[in-house]
Amino acid sequence: CIVRKVAGTLRDSVYAQMLWAINELGLNDEFDNTVSPLEITYKKTKQKIYFRGCDDPIKLKGIKTTFGYVGILWKEEKDQLAGEAEERNVNQSVLRGGDKSYDFSSYNPPKSKSNWVNKAKEVPNENRVIHHST
């Protein structure tokens, strides 16, 4: 599942980026995509990539897979979330029902060192990998 703070920003950003990547890899014939709901499906296994906004918590909690569970969460522009409480709510809403999950975040670090996302990354966590790129 890929989330952003505002659902209306998904289609022209991460959804388009994922479709671009599928095309670049020459895998168009292996995936189906829909815009309502915003999803990409791997034809062979029927696994889905869900795209959801955090501006409607009910829709996040309403994600129910036809089989398995959501095991990967990517929070795009994580710094736009209201804080750690909202992030925790997103995690608990999406990553449930399975015994193993992966949680990815991407964002441009805010200039203010006191921003919640900058503070949170400074807290030691042996299960976390932080990668900086430009």
Identify the residue ranges that each predicted region occupies.
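Phosphate/NTP-binding elements of NTP-utilizing enzymes
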Residues: 1-134
